[in-house]
Amino acid sequence: MESFEKLEKLLSYSFKNKELLIEALSHPSLRQHHEYKDDKDYERLEFLGDAVLNLVITEILFRNFANYNEGNLAKIRSYLVCKETICMVGAKLTLKNYIIMTHGEEVAGGRDNLNNIENATEALIAAIYLDSNIETTHDIIEKLWAEFIKVQNLTDYDPKTALQEWAQASDHHLPIYRLIKREGASHSSTFTVLVKVKDYEQTGTGHAIKEAEKNAARSLLHRLKND
């Protein structure tokens, strides 16, 4: 496990209360470990972090996307706070290297488990909020999510809806998605999905079926635009 100082540098934030940081990175498996003296793990912080993240992302979208209606804002927010995006932020922070877990959890692939990375990322947001204030937390979230927020094309946020709308506008049947391949262990599988609309088809991959479907839809949309 790497030192917390490296993580704080990536965050551009130094915790005043290091116990909050430790709690945010403590996997629930530790509660069953006889040598673990504390009964705290990241589950409660994750609950708070989810709410803080939703609030901050909602405010950012409301401020930056003045021409988008409520429906489109909701779709973009859904993309920004979904498991895949949160895990990409966690990957940027190399968060899997900092999660404190039992040896058994680690051997079972816990460091690459997307649920663990998502939960720890949300818990980390809550820890920053409790250690500082909403303004500081807002700035950190805006920085970490910047590359995703910059995408202003709804196609990139919600490619499945965009592809469905294209199919309907072109008088085609709705897109059909089919899982064609699954590779890897159960905790770190890679899925390949084929999407088909009329005579057009494209594949996409991801660590979840929904992610693979989105990537397939996005690839097909890009192909249709370039044809």
From Swiss-Prot:
Q: What is this protein called?
A: Ribonuclease 3
Catalytic activity field: Endonucleolytic cleavage to 5'-phosphomonoester
Required cofactor names:
Mg(2+)
Q: Which organism is it from?
A: Rickettsia rickettsii (strain Sheila Smith)
**Domain DRBM as annotated: residue spans:** 158-226
PANTHER family linked to this entry: RIBONUCLEASE 3 (PTHR11207:SF0), RIBONUCLEASE III (PTHR11207)
What is stated as this protein's family in its record?
Belongs to the ribonuclease III family.
InterPro entries (alphabetical): dsRBD_dom, RNase_III, RNase_III_dom, RNase_III_sf
